[in-house]
């Protein structure tokens, strides 16, 4: 059986032309080492393009690499891919003649998940799905919770490593992309075969990742078998009233279509969910549910008529029959992903409504000359833009425009600085309310909250939204637009001095007992774990032993928890001790908040329907 017939047998589909090209190239690097970049629009079958050469080894018995390590940016994406790949493994085992019971048993052993809560942490499954942070610490022979020794490092060296959704590996200081670029360099030197997959990626990010000199595998115009998706109409509205929202949802449901509403923050998602849940079978999905509740919601997602979610649905989620997507304005790459959730199959028709920032009338009248909607409104030639923390205004964009002035017959370049903030910034909002907008420096502002996103990226994305439907289908146009959006972001991004305290460890792959200090400050995926528990205070008083169940944990952003920490009136830390009977868990009053710890909160702060309530 050749690889094409193998693919047909386990997927019931004909392969696309680009997938066959990818398999040929991946087969070569599995033997000799190297890099492959796959750049395909959403719903184009990238996963199969990357993993089929490895899976085919189970049939051909021609083993070039013994292990596949599949790296994703978030745990939710890992969880989504696990069953998909396990199902392929089950079909392979059935082809090889295993019984149904044995197929189930072996599939679980062959496909392993690794992101910090499992009993073993050695990267020793045939197929290992993991998050970027876990992969990085495994390579450095360290784990943030417990010991890992050097097993994962050895396992990685003998694997085909796939980095999926790499457009999501970004943060304010570009710390993660820089580390990935560093790791890629080391892995290439060790002849580890690497595959990178994305739908959209700025050119400068490719340079940081160290993959800019690789010709990407993509869909060619002359391909006869290629991914095709449905027709999507994109509308833009500056305001969507509750009545309009209700009417749009009812219309879509009456046509037998699903509705997907994507909000930028958890709080705004909950607010919209409460408004629309009576209109049909509704489901709320975001990052602040327990592992068990989130898994249940993801299982039920196909039954829901209305799905309200945050960024967790931007990538890796294959929703069928979505006829209406309503989304907040977001960075261009995220917006392309969101629109890509709609009408994913050939023959489907769908509608997307992008809700543009709502212009507050009072601000509009009183401060019209201070408002910036997008950079198109600023006439400049030479400009430098970066994010700074200004003592008067908080986090703002610093825009420096160079002008040429003539004085006494001589020309000289005169830089002028402007500060631009967004109305999500509490400091700026307070200044506006108190009518103290002029203070030391002129303050211009974006008339909407850009949280949780970089305001610089948001106002550049605002300038591109009218053409976003084109970018869904055309990779080249999408890349050119992303280069425009991220131009200043990358050009002006300065490497923080204390970054090197972490950099040196990973550059030399040194062992370390605790993460470098900058590592704890800079990583956006740094987390803590919350565990809702009934009568937690009583259990502490009575010194009860706690039966810890990983299904009830909620992994939250460390930075988010730091901002909310004082709002939890009762919080405790989980203590794990080992004796001859195994692990014993008890509680103590929580001290200073630290990343990667497990904190117990009262179950009054948690709802199965809406998640953490705070």
Curated annotation (Swiss-Prot):
Binding-site residues for ATP, renumbered to this chain: 40-47
UniProt comment concerning the protein's domains: Proteins of this family have an N-terminal nuclease domain and a C-terminal helicase/ATPase domain. In some CRISPR/Cas systems the domains are swapped, in others they are encoded separately.
Annotated organism of origin: Methanocaldococcus jannaschii (strain ATCC 43067 / DSM 2661 / JAL-1 / JCM 10045 / NBRC 100440) (Methanococcus jannaschii)
Keyword Nucleotidyltransferase annotated: no
InterPro entries on file: Cas3-like_dom (IPR054712), DEAD/DEAH_box_helicase_dom (IPR011545), Helicase_ATP-bd (IPR014001), Helicase_C-like (IPR001650), Helicase_Cas3_CRISPR-ass_core (IPR006474), P-loop_NTPase (IPR027417)
Enzyme class: hydrolase
Name of the molecule in the record: CRISPR-associated helicase Cas3
Residue ranges annotated for the Helicase C-terminal domain, each copy included: 244-386
Function: CRISPR (clustered regularly interspaced short palindromic repeat), is an adaptive immune system that provides protection against mobile genetic elements (viruses, transposable elements and conjugative plasmids). CRISPR clusters contain sequences complementary to antecedent mobile elements and target invading nucleic acids. CRISPR clusters are transcribed and processed into CRISPR RNA (crRNA). Cas3 plus Cascade participate in CRISPR interference, the third stage of CRISPR immunity. Probably unwinds dsDNA templates, thus providing substrates for CRISPR-associated endonuclease Cas3-HD.
SUPFAM superfamilies associated with the record: P-loop containing nucleoside triphosphate hydrolases
Record's keyword annotation contains Hydrolase: yes
Location of the Helicase ATP-binding domain: 27-219
Lineage: Archaea, Methanobacteriati, Methanobacteriota, Methanomada group, Methanococci
Pfam families reported for this sequence: Cas3-like_C_2, DEAD
UniProt record similarity statement: Belongs to the CRISPR-associated helicase Cas3 family.
Single GO biological process annotation from the record: defense response to virus
EC number: 3.6.4.-
Gene name linked to the record: cas3
Entry GO MF terms: ATP binding; catalytic activity, acting on DNA; helicase activity; hydrolase activity; mRNA binding
Keywords for the protein's UniProt record, in alphabetical order: Antiviral defense, ATP-binding, Helicase, Hydrolase, Nucleotide-binding
Superkingdom of source: Archaea
């Amino acid at each position: 059986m050749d690889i094409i017939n193998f693919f047909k047998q386990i997927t019931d589909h004909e392969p696309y032309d680009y997938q066959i090209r990818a398999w040929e190239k991946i087969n070569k690097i599995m033997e000799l080492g190297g890099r492959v970049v796959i750049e395909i629009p959403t719903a184009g079958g990238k996963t199969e393009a990357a993993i089929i050469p490895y899976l085919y080894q189970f049939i051909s018995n021609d083993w070039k690499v013994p292990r596949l390590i599949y790296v994703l940016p978030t745990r939710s994406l890992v969880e989504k891919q696990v069953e998909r790949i396990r199902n392929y493994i089950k079909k392979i085992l059935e082809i090889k003649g295993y019984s149904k019971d044995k197929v189930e048993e072996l599939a679980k052993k062959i496909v392993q998940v690794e992101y910090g809560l499992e009993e073993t942490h050695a990267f020793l499954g045939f197929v290992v799905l993991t998050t970027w942070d876990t992969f990085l610490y495994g390579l450095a022979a360290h784990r943030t919770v417990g010991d890992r020794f050097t097993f994962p490092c050895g396992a990685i060296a003998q694997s085909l490593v796939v980095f999926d959704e790499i457009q999501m590996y970004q943060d304010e200081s570009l710390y993660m992309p820089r580390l990935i670029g560093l790791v890629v360099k080391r892995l290439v030197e060790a002849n580890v075969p690497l595959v990178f997959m994305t739908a959209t990626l700025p050119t400068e990010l490719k340079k940081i990742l160290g993959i800019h000199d690789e010709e990407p595998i993509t869909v060619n115009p002359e391909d006869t078998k290629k991914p095709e998706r449905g027709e999507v109409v994109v509308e833009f509205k500056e305001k969507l009233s509750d009545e309009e929202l209700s009417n749009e949802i009812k219309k879509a449901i009456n046509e037998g279509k699903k509705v997907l509403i994507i909000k930028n923050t958890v709080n705004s998602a909950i607010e919209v969910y409460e408004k629309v849940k009576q209109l049909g079978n509704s489901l709320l999905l975001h990052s602040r549910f327990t592992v068990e509740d989130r898994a249940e919601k993801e299982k039920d997602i196909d039954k829901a008529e209305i799905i309200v979610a945050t960024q967790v649905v931007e990538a890796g989620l294959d929703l069928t029959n979505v006829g209406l997507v309503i989304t907040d304005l977001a960075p261009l790459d995220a917006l392309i992903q969101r629109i890509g959730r709609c009408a994913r199959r050939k023959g489907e028709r769908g509608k997307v409504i992008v809700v543009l920032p709502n212009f507050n009338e009072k601000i509009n009248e009183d401060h019209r000359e201070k408002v910036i909607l997008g950079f198109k409104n600023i006439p400049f030639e030479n400009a430098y833009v970066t994010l700074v923390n200004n003592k008067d205004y908080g986090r703002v964009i610093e825009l420096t425009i160079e002008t040429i002035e003539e004085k006494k017959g001589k020309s000289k370049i005169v830089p002028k600085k402007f500060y631009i903030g967004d109305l999500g910034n509490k400091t700026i909002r307070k200044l506006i309310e108190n009518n103290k907008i002029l203070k030391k420096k002129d303050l211009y502002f974006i008339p909407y909250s850009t949280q949780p996103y970089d305001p610089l990226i948001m106002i550049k994305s605002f300038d591109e939204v009218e053409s976003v439907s084109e970018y869904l289908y055309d990779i080249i146009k999408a890349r050119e637009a992303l280069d425009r959006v991220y131009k200043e972001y990358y050009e002006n991004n300065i490497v923080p001095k204390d970054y090197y305290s972490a950099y040196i460890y990973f550059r030399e792959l040194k062992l370390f007992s605790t993460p470098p200090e900058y590592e704890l400050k800079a990583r956006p995926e740094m987390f803590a774990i919350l565990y809702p528990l009934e009568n937690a205070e009583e259990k502490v008083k009575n010194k009860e032993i706690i039966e810890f169940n990983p299904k009830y944990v909620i992994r939250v952003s460390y930075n988010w928890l730091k901002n909310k920490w004082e709002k939890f009136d009762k919080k405790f830390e989980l203590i794990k001790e080992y004796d001859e009977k195994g692990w014993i868990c008890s509680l103590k009053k929580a001290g200073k908040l630290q990343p990667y710890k497990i904190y117990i909160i009262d179950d009054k702060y948690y709802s199965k329907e809406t998640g953490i309530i705070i």
